[in-house]
Amino acid sequence: MKLIFDVSDKPKAGQLVVFALQQMLAILAATIAVPLIIGNGLTPAAAMFGAGVGTIVYILFTKRKSPVFLGSSFAFLGSMAAAFAGGVSMQLGMLGLIVGAFLAGLVYVVIAIVVKFVGVGWLNKLMPAVVIGPTVAIIGLSLAGNAIGDLVKGDVTKQVTEYAVSTDSGTPEIIETVSNVPVGSSYVALICGLITLAVVMLCSTYGKKTLRLIPFIIGILAGYAAAAIFTVIGNICDIGALKIVDFSVFSSYMLTDGSVSLKTFVSLPDFAFVSGLKGLKEFDFTYFATIFVAYVPVALVVFAEHVADHKNLSSIIDHDLLEEPGLTRTLLGDGVGSIAGALFGGCPNTTYGESVACVAITGNASVITIFAAAIGCMLFSFITPLVAFVDSIPACVMGGVCIALYGFIAVSGLKMIQDANLDDNKNLFVVSVILIAGIGGLTLTFGDITLTEVAAALILGILTNVMLSKKKGNAAKK
């Protein structure tokens, strides 16, 4: 595709700051979601810092030739939860996260060494475009439910208590369940999300050069402004349906001890290694085995997603990243970057499809933009009001952004198979299996290890391709 800024281009200083901010906004929602889901002492600020560190390591390993941001990996959510299973202390759990990320990164390093000696020819045969294309599409389509779920949801919540009768113990018992439900109307949230999406699309399609480069910033600001106006009116008139933005996050971040202090403006993130070092005395072989089993198999599957992301990015920038800088370097960058990032944030990192989509939609593939975004994430993590602002962006606004991002990932995957001959039954079956398995939500669970629909669909696609290729070869011989 036609790029406004190529990989080696350097935007002007003012532009660079704005472009970097846009990349940050594209990846931050998912990056901070992982620590919020896991809890146990993990914080969004530390995850932001770790993502920045991991991205810089990746850029250095790839010789500044691959424009993609590394963020917290959702594939390892089950693995991370296993690190805290069994009632272990927070300190031991943090150490487990770091050890797990090291093991996952080590898997990448080992594969990189193998690729260094045997090349990538085998990989292209195992995962041709007819396999990678629909897999990339599934990466986007599998996130569609998240985008739509967020699109109709505000962030202001209230506690609701529900009662149910349980007979599990043999005698009827009343079970009390407390949950947080949105106060705002789903229709008001939908309006804010659609305003965001509309502004993104209009800026990207009809905007002049500058607007076309920053559609997500303009879209998020427009959606946030609309949501804030609704919320202010809702607070003044006491109309719960209009309350979308949760402004209380500013006080929870900035007034931690109930008063204004230095932490109101600047604070040190809770780095994982600080707590992890305190867990060394509890670490034993049994716990190591638990972490090994939880992380290593998942890393093997995520490797395939790594290849898919880089083939997708290669098609966007019109340069084969698996050849130059080479799969060895991208794997080393991803693996070592993930280890470095987890030391600070606790979360293994991975190349982000949102970042790739941002590159494609804006036409800005400048690596210096990604580098600046990484530095920005690290700086943001220390500035309390900025962390609070990012956390206050309503789900519906990010849902509008994600429709564009996830949709573009899906479409770019489908574009990768446009040259494949789908009149050939072999190719038709490979694509069909991957799409239906992925969209259908096929997951495979082995103990504490869960293979996502993307991983399961990719594995089925590879097996189908290998099986039918062999059959076709045998038929040709006969």
Where are these regions (language model features)?
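Short, Lys/Arg-rich, polar N-terminal cytosolic tail immediately upstream
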Residues: M1-A13
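Membrane-embedded helical hairpins/re-entrant loop segments and their flanking transmembrane helices
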Residues: P11-A13, I37-V57, A294-V367
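Hydrophobic, membrane-embedded alpha-helices of multi-pass small-molecule transporters
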Residues: G14-A30, G184-L197, I214, S261-D309, ...
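Early transmembrane hairpin of solute transport permeases
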Residues: Q15-G193, F382-P385, S392, C396, ...
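Hydrophobic core segments of alpha-helical transmembrane domains in multi-pass membrane transport
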Residues: F19-I27, I32-P35, G50-I59, S79-A83, ...
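Flexible hinge motifs at transmembrane-helix junctions and intramembrane kinks/re-entrant loops
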Residues: N40-T43, S185, V199-F273, V293-A308, ...
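Hydrophobic alpha-helical bundle architecture
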Residues: G41, I59-S66, V336-F344, T350-G447
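Inter-helical loop and helix-membrane interface segments of multi-pass membrane transporters/permeases
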Residues: A82-L95, G121, L141-K208, I236-E282, ...
